[in-house]
Amino acid sequence: MRTGRIIKSLSGVYRVDSDGEMFDTKPRGLFRKKKFSPIVGDIVDFEIENVTEGYIQHVHERQNELKRPPVSNIDHLVIVMSAVEPDFSTQLVDRFLVIAHSYGLNPRIVVTKKDMASDSQIERIEKDLDVYRAIGYPVQFVGKNDNIETIFDEWGSGLAVLSGQSGVGKSTLLNAYRPDLAIETNQISKSLNRGKHTTRHVELFERKGGFVADTPGFSALDFDHIHKDEVKDYFLEIQEYGQGCKFRNCNHIKEPQCNVKAQVEAGNIAQFRYDHYVQLFEEIANRKERY
């Protein structure tokens, strides 16, 4: 019996990396009976059938898991945004951060295309990024002339998953780091100011200290698993200052003696962060139940 990590899944076949050796494996029938499917990122025990093939016998417990796209045991969720084409959006950053925290992931922010932005755009973006740095998020603002290897090394060991809307440069980052991958990239649609997703399945690629994955289908952010009363816990500074509110169940909207609103007034919580919190709270509060 050997142990390895699923790095790719295609048509019911799971490619497992076991100490640098690759095996194409299939799950035993017992998984079908349990209606359980292995996913990319899983740590598995498998029996070797021949030199390059085997059967998965056991899936280790997942430390965390994304539903869409399906990937598990993520150490870092890298939120990739671009300075321009498409334009940098703090609202989108905040929505990705909420998703990250809701799944128990460690998020970090990477902004690309610095070389394509004007001085005034860079100044505005840096001002916004300082807000995230002050909260405690690791932030990188990079252009095509930056050392890509250094950017990836800063992420530390383990599995780093790239997330972000289409066209922000996720595949370009990977290609610069690993030119041998030749991942397809797409030009930005001028009419929509965004790209089409070029990555069609989740695959883990080796990097120094671990793996990195690009993720398809990560532009339609899904908050169905989040209750409105949980949203405040996923805005870290709101969660912290919320402990000073008079009422324990304060949602920081219309409640009296709210410390969060007082800290927004005092400038200790960025207005845009509070506005995005309120928008998302109301969006989730007003959604219709799905049956």
Swiss-Prot record:
Q: So what EC number does this one have?
A: 3.6.1.-
Cofactor(s) for this protein? Zn(2+)
Q: PROSITE patterns attached here?
A: ENGC_GTPASE, G_CP
Q: Which cellular component terms (GO) are annotated to the entry?
A: cytoplasm
The UniProt record gives the binding positions of Zn(2+) as: C245, C250, H252, C258
GO BP term, pick one: ribosomal small subunit biogenesis
Q: Which domain of life is it from?
A: Bacteria
- Top-level EC class, please? hydrolase
Supply the InterPro entries for this chain.
G_CP_dom, NA-bd_OB-fold, P-loop_NTPase, Ribosome_biogen_GTPase_RsgA, RsgA_GTPase_dom, RsgA_N
This protein's UniProt keywords: Cytoplasm, GTP-binding, Hydrolase, Metal-binding, Nucleotide-binding, Ribosome biogenesis, RNA-binding, rRNA-binding, Zinc
- Pfam families associated with the record: RsgA_GTPase, RsgA_N
Q: Give the cofactor note text.
A: Binds 1 zinc ion per subunit.
The GO terms this record gives for MF are: GTP binding; GTPase activity; metal ion binding; rRNA binding
> Gene3D superfamilies in the record, alphabetically?
Nucleic acid-binding proteins, P-loop containing nucleotide triphosphate hydrolases, Probable gtpase engc, domain 3
Fetch the SUPFAM superfamilies from UniProt.
Answer: Nucleic acid-binding proteins, P-loop containing nucleoside triphosphate hydrolases
Compartment(s)? Cytoplasm
Residues holding GTP: T112, K113, K114, D115, G164, Q165, S166, G167, V168, G169, K170, S171, T172
The CP-type G domain sits at: 63-221
State whether it acts alone or in a complex, and with which partners, per the record.
Monomer. Associates with 30S ribosomal subunit, binds 16S rRNA.
PANTHER family for this protein: SMALL RIBOSOMAL SUBUNIT BIOGENESIS GTPASE RSGA, SMALL RIBOSOMAL SUBUNIT BIOGENESIS GTPASE RSGA 1, MITOCHONDRIAL-RELATED
The record's HAMAP family line, in alphabetical order, gives:
GTPase_RsgA
Q: Which family does it belong to?
A: Belongs to the TRAFAC class YlqF/YawG GTPase family. RsgA subfamily.
Sum up the protein's function in the record's words.
One of several proteins that assist in the late maturation steps of the functional core of the 30S ribosomal subunit. Helps release RbfA from mature subunits. May play a role in the assembly of ribosomal proteins into the subunit. Circularly permuted GTPase that catalyzes slow GTP hydrolysis, GTPase activity is stimulated by the 30S ribosomal subunit.
Protein's name in the database:
Small ribosomal subunit biogenesis GTPase RsgA
Organism of origin is Staphylococcus carnosus (strain TM300)
This protein's encoding gene: rsgA
